[in-house]
């Protein structure tokens, strides 16, 4: 069989030898040094690129991990600064209150997930925080009473409207005597 180049001849030989290696158990492919000498320049270049690409992946993973660590530390620092700025103010906007509630929920869930606390001081602080939260929750009951008063005021407005309709001060849309059917009696329908 005639080949146009040594590279195509080598490629055909390697495919045949790989085929025999898969079929025949004792067949060996040959020396790697002989293959290196018979390879064309493009094949040598592609082999070098394949070999160098493996460490590049590891380097990329390391750099990505470093970048991720830096970004995480930056976001933590920004959150800490934002919290300190909000904490220093006496009056908070609606967005700031939402942010603080979100922080409280997140921190409460993290504390709840802790299984055991070794340090006694931390445990005492945690119990103090729990007690203060319970006190704050107890104060919210007064707000609910105010809400009940508001709903009763709304109900009184509806009652006033009903009284005015009964007295005839306000008319309610519906059938008027001029629009009722001529032969219609209420006693007939019952």
Swiss-Prot record:
Functional note: Involved in ribosome biogenesis, probably through modulation of rDNA transcription.
Origin: domain of life: Eukaryota
Similarity comment: family membership: Belongs to the RRT14 family.
Cellular compartments per GO CC: nucleolus
Compartments reported by the entry: Nucleus, Nucleolus
Entries under InterPro entries matching the protein: Rrt14
UniProt keyword annotations, A-Z: Nucleus, Transcription, Transcription regulation
Source taxonomy: Eukaryota, Fungi, Dikarya, Ascomycota, Saccharomycotina
Protein name according to UniProt: Regulator of rDNA transcription 14
Key word Transcription regulation present: yes
Source organism of the structure: Scheffersomyces stipitis (strain ATCC 58785 / CBS 6054 / NBRC 10063 / NRRL Y-11545)
């Amino acid at each position: 069989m005639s080949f146009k180049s040594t590279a195509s001849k080598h490629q055909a030989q390697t495919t045949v030898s790989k085929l025999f290696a898969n079929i025949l158990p004792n067949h060996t492919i040959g020396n790697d040094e002989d293959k290196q000498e018979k390879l064309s320049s493009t094949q040598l270049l592609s082999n070098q690129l394949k070999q160098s690409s493996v460490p590049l992946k590891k380097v990329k993973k390391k750099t990505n991990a470093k970048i991720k660590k830096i970004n995480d530390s930056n976001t933590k620092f920004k959150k800490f600064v934002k919290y300190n700025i909000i904490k220093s103010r006496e009056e908070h906007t609606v967005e700031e209150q939402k942010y603080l509630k979100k922080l409280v929920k997140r921190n409460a869930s993290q504390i709840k997930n802790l299984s055991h606390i070794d340090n006694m001081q931390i445990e005492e602080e945690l119990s103090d925080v729990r007690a203060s939260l319970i006190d704050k929750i107890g104060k919210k009951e007064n707000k609910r009473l105010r809400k009940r008063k508001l709903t009763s005021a709304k109900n009184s407005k509806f009652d006033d409207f009903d009284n005015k309709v009964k007295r005839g001060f306000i008319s309610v849309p519906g059938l008027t005597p001029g629009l009722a059917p001529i032969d219609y009696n209420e006693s007939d329908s019952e």
